[in-house]
């Protein structure tokens, strides 16, 4: 657990007005912090389009028959498409393993989306990729939310 499983938003940051903000890419072209106050008004009403035009740092596209889904690496949204409808935004797409994307991030995003749909409340949401040195891929992702 990070911070005893307590959200790290200050009182000044908390709001019920929907917004989304994506930091500029760093000097190596890597994603930085992504933050949003997510309400139903930000959630997509149409299906996701292709994101294949975005090549995040560290991107490798090789399929393997022995890997579930075929690919070791996925293009991963920092803030999932189902939450804000952001599609091929290079400031919101990182290279991550399929496992991290499907088993790590997706269940958390599903839980947040279900909560918003069921309650019509807003959720403060922040994702920070931690990059060490000149590496292309984050070694850690920290996702925080507050209802």
Kindly give the residue locations of the regions a language model identified.
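Domain-level detector of nuclease and nuclease-like folds
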Residues: 9-147
């Amino acid at each position: 657990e990070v911070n005893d499983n307590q959200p790290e938003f200050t009182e000044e940051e908390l709001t019920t007005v929907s917004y989304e903000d994506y930091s500029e890419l760093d000097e190596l072209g890597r994603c930085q912090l992504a933050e949003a106050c997510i309400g139903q008004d930000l959630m997509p009403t149409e299906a996701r389009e292709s994101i294949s035009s975005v090549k995040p740092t560290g991107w490798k596209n090789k399929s393997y028959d022995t890997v579930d889904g075929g690919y070791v690496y996925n293009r991963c949204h920092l803030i999932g498409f189902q939450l804000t409808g952001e599609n091929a935004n290079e400031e919101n797409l990182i290279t991550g393993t399929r496992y991290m994307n499907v088993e790590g991030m997706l269940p958390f995003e599903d839980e947040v989306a279900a909560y918003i749909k069921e309650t019509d409340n807003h959720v403060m949401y922040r994702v920070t990729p931690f990059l060490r040195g000149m590496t292309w891929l984050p070694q850690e992702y920290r996702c925080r939310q507050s209802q």
